[in-house]
Regions:
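Charged catalytic cores and adjacent phosphate/nucleic-acid-binding surfaces used
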Residues: 2-18, 31, 174-260
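Short, surface-exposed basic-aromatic patches at helix termini and helix-loop junctions that form
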Residues: 36, 95-100, 215-218
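Conserved beta-strand positions in the central sheet of alpha/beta enzyme cores
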Residues: 46-48, 106, 159, 199
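Flexible loop residues that form catalytic
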Residues: 50-51, 110, 163, 203
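Extended substrate/RNA-proximal surfaces in nucleic-acid metabolism proteins
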Residues: 59-193, 245
Length: 260
C-alpha cells in the first residue's frame, strides 16, 4: 500500500491518486488492471489518459475515441478525467456536453510557445540555438506559458508544472537558479488567481519545497498524482505524501473531486 498519513482533520493524505494512465493512451496497464491495483493498494484513482491530437497514434485523439474512452471509465469505480496538452487547442474546442462528463480535467506543459512562433519542449536534453546561449530567457518564456496555462485552460489541475528541460539542469543543477524567487512568485500568483490545483508529482518528484511552501501560504490547492504509466507506479504516492507533510500541506489544502 502507498503511504497514507493521518492529518489533523482526522482523514488521510494519499488516499487519492488523481493522475493515472492506461493502455487507452501511452500507459502500459489496462484499465481493469489499474482498477484492481488501486483496490489492492487502498487508493482511489482518477484515470487521466492523454486526450490530444498531437500524437494520434498513442493518444485519445478523435471524437469517437473520446466518447468510447469516457464510456469505459464511467463504468468503473474511478474518477473520470483526462490530461490535456497546453500545446494543443483541443481542450477549448470540445463541446460542453463532453467536458461536463469529466469529474475534473488536467492540463500539462508538454510544449510551450516561443516568440518566433516555434515551440520548445520541457524534455529538451540539449538546448538548440539560440536558446543554448539564452537559457534564462528560455526559462522566462516557459514560466510565462505556465501562467497562461493555468489562467486560460479549462482545467482543475496542473500536472508536473515545474518540470523543465534537462538541458537547463546540465548548465546548473540547483533548481533555484532557474526557479528564482521572482519566477516562483509569478507562477504561484497565477495558480492562486486561477483556482487551479497544483499537482505534487510522485513520478517527477516536483514541485520543489520552496515553491510548495509559497503556494500553501498563498492559499493554493493541491493534488497528489503518481502519473502512473506502469504497474509499479499506479497508486504509489510515497514521495508525494512525504513532501506534502514536510512542507505543511494537509488534507484541508487538497482539491477533492466528486463524480459528475
Amino acid at each position: 500500500m502507498t503511504a497514507v498519513s493521518p492529518t489533523a482533520e482526522g482523514v488521510t493524505l494519499g488516499s487519492q491518486d488523481l493522475h493515472v494512465h492506461t493502455t487507452m493512451s501511452d500507459g502500459e496497464v489496462p484499465l481493469e488492471e489499474v482498477v484492481r491495483l488501486a483496490a489492492e493498494r487502498g487508493v482511489k484513482v482518477g484515470i487521466a489518459d492523454h486526450v490530444s491530437t498531437r500524437n494520434p497514434q498513442r493518444f485519445v485523439a478523435t471524437d469517437a475515441q473520446l466518447r468510447r474512452y469516457l464510456e469505459r471509465i464511467e463504468a468503473e469505480p474511478v474518477f473520470v478525467s483526462a490530461e490535456f496538452c497546453w500545446c494543443d487547442p483541443l481542450s477549448t474546442a470540445l463541446p460542453p456536453e463532453i467536458m461536463d462528463r469529466f469529474d475534473y480535467r488536467i492540463g500539462s506543459n508538454h510544449g510551450f510557445s516561443l516568440p518566433d512562433d516555434g515551440w520548445a519542449s520541457p524534455w529538451w536534453s540539449d538546448l538548440p540555438d539560440p536558446w543554448n546561449a539564452r537559457p534564462h530567457e528560455l526559462m522566462d518564456h516557459m514560466v510565462a506559458n505556465l501562467c497562461d496555462l493555468v489562467t486560460t485552460m479549462p482545467i482543475e489541475i496542473v500536472a508536473h508544472s515545474t518540470f523543465m528541460p534537462s538541458g537547463l539542469m546540465e548548465i546548473e543543477r540547483d533548481v533555484h537558479a532557474w526557479w528564482t524567487e521572482e519566477r516562483e512568485d509569478r507562477f504561484v500568483e497565477a495558480v492562486v488567481a486561477s483556482g487551479v490545483a497544483l499537482e505534487i508529482s510522485n513520478r517527477y518528484r516536483l514541485p520543489h519545497d520552496r515553491l510548495l511552501r509559497k503556494a500553501k501560504q498563498a492559499g493554493a490547492r493541491f493534488t497528489l498524482g503518481s502519473d502512473g504509466h506502469r504497474a509499479a507506479q499506479v497508486a504509489r504516492l510515497d514521495w508525494a505524501v512525504e513532501t506534502a507533510l514536510r512542507v505543511g500541506i494537509g488534507e484541508g489544502d487538497m482539491f477533492v473531486p466528486e463524480r459528475a
